[in-house]
A protein has these predicted regions:
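Bacterial lipoprotein signal-peptidase II cleavage site
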Residues: 8-25
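Extracytoplasmic small-molecule ligand-binding "clamshell" domains
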Residues: 44-128
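Short loop->beta-strand "edge-of-pocket" segments that line small-molecule binding or catalytic clefts
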Residues: 52-54, 73-80, 164-179, 192-194
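Short helix-initiation/N-cap motifs at beta->coil->alpha
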Residues: 86-88, 103-115, 160, 195-210, ...
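Extended ligand-binding regions for polar small-molecule ligands
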Residues: 88-97, 155-157, 170-172, 179, ...
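Acidic, polar ligand-binding/catalytic clefts
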Residues: 96, 101-167, 242-249
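A ligand-binding cleft/hinge motif common to bilobed small-molecule-binding domains
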Residues: 111, 127-137, 183-188, 214-250
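Periplasmic-binding protein-like
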Residues: 146-153, 229-265
Length: 265
């Protein structure tokens, strides 16, 4: 049977409480490809020579949409656009190890897990945290990234010099729907005015840029990318200290999800 590069496991690491960890990517592909050539995933588009991978294509730097194949971008199924980013690079490495061509499927965040469960796609590589709730629905690889939490605000904001979560008290805040940034981190800000969640990361950043909120909470790679796109932003990293957002290890472990019992991957 084919072996997925990251190694299959039903859940992430333990749920001991921890502050935001430093990022440490482990995107090494499987060393052996001989076994991979013999067996292919049965789901996805039904083509045993294709690895069908779902992602938002709107979560830079993990994944994004562009109009050409520059830098090795992969065409999005049913579209003239292409996808690229860390997650696409990971998908291509796995495809190489399995001897399969990678096909990218663009889906909304809330549609990713259902697509895996139904077999519409082989796997999801989309900056997904390995939470207990998700692991009850799908299988996960070992983590390939450990996300760290940051806060974005504007340089002229009253919160630009915040040194801890406590300093964010009273802020108007938002983040992306269905993420730990919105569900777990924002409630930790005292007296925060928490707005409705945004549909995706670009909408989140545009809300901050338009002055609809004082701060947004996200992960470090997204934050660094935002600083390039929005020069008026400043990124606050509380360094995983006691004054940082408190999260469990499972919430910051990023893995690849696949259908329960999919031993081929």
């Amino acid at each position: 049977a084919a072996v997925m590069a990251a190694g299959l496991t039903a859940c992430g690491s333990g749920a001991d409480t921890a502050s935001a960890a430093s990022p440490a990517a482990d995107s090494t592909a499987a060393e052996s490809t001989e076994a991979a050539a013999d067996t292919a995933a049965p789901d996805g588009d039904g083509d045993p020579t294709t690895l069908t991978v779902a992602m938002e294509c709107a979560y830079a730097p993990y994944n994004w949409t562009q109009n050409d194949d520059a830098n090795g971008a992969v065409e999005i199924r049913g579209s003239s656009d292409y996808a690229y980013g860390y997650d696409v690079m990971m998908a291509k490495k796995i495809g190489e190890a399995l001897g399969q061509k990678v096909q990218i499927v663009k889906l909304d965040w809330d549609s990713l897990i259902p697509a895996v469960m139904s077999g519409d796609v082989d796997c999801v590589i989309a900056g997904q945290s390995i939470t207990a709730e998700r692991a009850a629905q799908v299988d996960f690889s070992d983590p390939y990234y450990y996300a760290s939490i940051v806060t974005l605000t504007k340089k002229d904001s009253a919160y630009a010099n915040a040194a801890s979560v406590a300093d964010l008290a009273g802020a108007t805040a938002t983040s992306q729907l269905g993420t730990i940034w919105y569900d777990t981190c924002l409630p930790q800000i005292e007296d925060a005015n928490v707005l409705s969640a945004t549909a995706n990361a670009p909408d989140m950043l545009m809300s901050l840029n338009a002055g609809k909120c004082d701060i947004v909470v996200t992960d470090q790679p997204t934050g660094k990318g935002a600083l390039i796109a929005y020069p008026d932003f400043v990124m606050l990293d509380f360094g995983g200290a006691e004054g940082d957002f408190q999260v469990t290890n499972e919430e910051i472990n990023i893995g690849i999800s696949m259908k329960k019992g999919n031993t081929e991957l």
